[in-house]
């Protein structure tokens, strides 16, 4: 397993989702095009500082948002961020709501997921990389870092952004949206939100011993709500314009909060758990 002690750390990696591909957050130091044993990441890595705090930005869907969810190279993205010295990951993701109380423009700090993907590489331990030998059975009872979840919640509160402290994300394969039957099924399963990117991203972060938390930005009610328009690209993009400004403010505050905390023991524990999950 890759260990953070082998490189300068612990930088904060920010994975931007739909509507957050801009680098205006940063004082940019450089832009690095890199390769990994799993191929090229979705975008260049943007190294820079946010109020003097070292961060690395990666655009999940590419600089021009031209990579569909199935084709995102999640393994390369996480591997590249780890190699760049990131042990802490803050991710943003646009999503639909499966529950009445989670309204468009609300934010949600995800704490669980339901995996409905079918076509993605979900582990680094596929026998192809000599650095990743064996089979990894990573525990997923609590996939997201609780301390980072609290950071995101605090950052939302500081900025007076409506945010819910927990939610179960249903990640579908996409790129199509759900049917009415699927949307209602996911609601019955206990799903709170629906998107196309949380899995396998959070799983892979755990395999690398990274602390990971995701800020979900609600854009719509999917297609289950009878008195609300069904999800479509036009309406999603309109809501994302509203969400984007709030998301940037929250990320700035979150980075500042993290910089004042000592997360090294948590990182070491995450790396130990990842290492102990590998059967050789």
From Swiss-Prot:
Entry's localization field: Cytoplasm; Nucleus
Chain sites annotated for binding phosphate: 18, 60-61, 93-94, 197
Q: So what EC number does this one have?
A: 2.4.2.28
Query: Where does this chain mainly localize?
Result: cytoplasm
InterPro entries from the UniProt entry = MTAP, Nucleoside_phosphorylase_d, Nucleoside_phosphorylase_sf, Purine_phosphorylase-2_CS
Give TM segment ranges. Answer: none
Which pathway features in its UniProt record? Amino-acid biosynthesis; L-methionine biosynthesis via salvage pathway; S-methyl-5-thio-alpha-D-ribose 1-phosphate from S-methyl-5'-thioadenosine (phosphorylase route): step 1/1
Q: Which reaction does it catalyse?
A: S-methyl-5'-thioadenosine + phosphate = 5-(methylsulfanyl)-alpha-D-ribose 1-phosphate + adenine
- Looking at the keywords, is Glycosyltransferase present? yes
Q: Which CDD domains match?
A: MTAP_SsMTAPII_like_MTIP
The alphabetized UniProt keywords are: Cytoplasm, Glycosyltransferase, Nucleus, Purine salvage, Transferase
| MF terms in GO | S-methyl-5-thioadenosine phosphorylase activity
PANTHER family per record:
S-METHYL-5'-THIOADENOSINE PHOSPHORYLASE (PTHR42679:SF2)
What's this chain's function? Catalyzes the reversible phosphorylation of S-methyl-5'-thioadenosine (MTA) to adenine and 5-methylthioribose-1-phosphate. Involved in the breakdown of MTA, a major by-product of polyamine biosynthesis. Responsible for the first step in the methionine salvage pathway after MTA has been generated from S-adenosylmethionine. Has broad substrate specificity with 6-aminopurine nucleosides as preferred substrates.
Subunit structure, interactors included: Homotrimer.
Q: Which family does it belong to?
A: Belongs to the PNP/MTAP phosphorylase family. MTAP subfamily.
Q: What is this protein called?
A: S-methyl-5'-thioadenosine phosphorylase
Q: What is the lineage of its organism?
A: Eukaryota, Metazoa, Chordata, Tunicata, Ascidiacea
């Amino acid at each position: 397993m890759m260990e953070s002690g082998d490189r300068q750390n612990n930088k904060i990696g920010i994975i931007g989702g739909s509507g957050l591909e801009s680098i205006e957050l940063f004082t940019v130091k450089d832009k690095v095009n890199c390769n990994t044993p799993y191929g090229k990441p979705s975008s260049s890595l943007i190294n820079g500082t946010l109020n003097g705090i070292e961060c690395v930005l990666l655009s999940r869907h590419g600089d021009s948002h031209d990579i569909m969810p199935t084709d995102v190279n999640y393994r390369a993205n996480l591997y590249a961020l780890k190699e760049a010295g990131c042990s802490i990951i803050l991710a943003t993701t646009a999503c639909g709501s499966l529950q009445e109380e989670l309204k468009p423009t609300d934010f949600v700090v995800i704490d669980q997921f339901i995996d409905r993907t079918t076509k993605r590489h979900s582990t680094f331990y596929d026998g192809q990389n000599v650095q990743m030998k064996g089979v990894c059975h990573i525990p997923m009872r609590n996939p997201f870092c609780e301390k980072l979840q609290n950071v995101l919640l605090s950052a939302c509160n500081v900025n007076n952004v409506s945010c819910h402290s927990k939610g179960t994300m249903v990640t579908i394969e996409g790129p199509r949206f759900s049917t009415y039957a699927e949307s209602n099924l996911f609601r019955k399963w206990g799903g709170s939100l629906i998107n196309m990117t949380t899995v396998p991203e959070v799983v892979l972060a755990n395999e690398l011993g990274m602390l990971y938390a995701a800020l979900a930005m609600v854009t719509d009610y999917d297609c289950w709500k009878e008195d609300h328009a069904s999800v479509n690209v036009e309406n999603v993009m309109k809501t994302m314009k509203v969400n984007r400004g709030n998301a940037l403010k929250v990320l700035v505050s979150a980075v500042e909060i993290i910089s004042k905390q000592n997360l090294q023991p948590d990182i070491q524990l995450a790396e130990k758990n990842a290492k102990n999950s590998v059967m050789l």
